[in-house]
Amino acid sequence: MVSFESSFERGTDFLNRNFKKCLFACISIFIFALLALSFLSLLQPDTVQRLYQCAVPSMIYVPPMINEAISIQHEEFNNRRRRLSAALREDKLDALIMEPTVSMDYFANITTGSWGLSERPFLGIIFSDDEPYPGDVASRIYFLVPKFELPRAKELVGKNIDAKYITWDEDENPYQVLYDRLGPLKLMIDGTVRNFIAQGLQYAGFTTFGVSPRVASLREIKSPAEVDIMSRVNIATVAAIRSVQPCIKPGITEKELAEVINMLFVYGGLPVQESPIVLFGERAAMPHGGPSNRRLKKSEFVLMDVGTTLFGYHSDCTRTVLPHGQKMTERMEKLWNLVYDAQTAGIQMLSHLSNTSCAEVDLAARKVIKDAGYGEYFIHRLGHGLGLEEHEQTYLNPANKGTPVQKGNVFTVEPGIYIPDEIGIRIEDAVLASDVPILLTNFRAKSPYEP
């Protein structure tokens, strides 16, 4: 007869053996399930990838358009330096001095991207076309450069400019070296020159002046080559917005949508934007708010203010859209149409070139919104100049009464209504002032469903 104790022990051994097997089987199944889910997640794209895959087919025409763009050519840079030299003569100054920022980009095709700013000054000097500096000013440009950087500077400047180089050793004062070489000149200091450099030039003995309106205005009138570049990059920008709009669904976050727009720029052969403005619902009442993890709700406006660059020239475009299948309230539709009508009024003013001031353009658009009772919610200027800088002279604001609109100016026209904690709407296009204003975005928005 088997004792109770031995039966219990055999039963316990059986349970222990089978428990271990069951536990091992459960763990194996759990691990397999995790691996299967991970594999399925790889097969199923995340929100950003799904949105990108939905939008990118509509961008197919953008890469060829960008690839066919032609950069600013050598002769245009020569003409720019000639115009600068003539302006310096008019201002009775000897030269403009600049760092590798936007002005050196404009006059010599050298940018911060190709020569980063540091504590060691690398300066470009373009002279007046007056005596005692005779000859073709188009090629007469000096560069102050650290001696050990001279080969790099020559490679960067290239052979198209007959430049002169003034070098300084590490144990020398670069500003004194420049003064000893050039003498007591009257220098116009470019507005982007850093303060310690401006002070160094003054202490060395140069007489310095700020940038005159005459010189500052040289970049305001865009050449046909500039207009072509800016048109291409603005068309590409609005193409990204139009491509993604039908794909937007409630539940996406502002950051996810901003990431997709940058992915579309890269697909088009363009650089990403560091700070895109993508805002949903009431958050769009902050004109320059940044994207957050806020998720899109049903029947909310989506404001996208985005841009990129081509050969250094900026685009800037804003659309306030509604995802397909979502419905507007009467108030949303009324406010969107009001902003659209204000933009229409502003654009139309850019054809009145004889005696229209920048202030009048702003006030024409502002009047539309004010007359409808929403003037207090249009809280910024109508627009700004656009070019090698995203915001550059001149500005469409009510105080700019003394600056006329000129043929060849490129402005953004971007009225908006911003009601705190409720709604924000802005529509923006880049426009070339002309007898018939030219949209550099090619098409205006037609509705929140057709950006």
Curated annotation (Swiss-Prot):
Sequence positions that bind Mn(2+) 1: D316, H384, E414, E428
Cofactors that this protein relies on: Mn(2+)
InterPro entries: Creatin/AminoP/Spt16_N, Creatinase/aminopeptidase-like, Pept_M24, Peptidase_M24B, Peptidase_M24B_aminopep-P_CS
One annotated GO molecular function: dipeptidase activity
Cofactor: binding comment: Binds 2 manganese ions per subunit.
Protein residues bound to Mn(2+) 2: D305, D316, E428
Pfam families hit by this protein: Peptidase_M24 (PF00557)
Family (UniProt): Belongs to the peptidase M24B family.
Name of the protein described by the UniProt record: Uncharacterized peptidase C18A7.01
Organism: Schizosaccharomyces pombe (strain 972 / ATCC 24843) (Fission yeast)
Taxonomic placement: Eukaryota, Fungi, Dikarya, Ascomycota, Taphrinomycotina
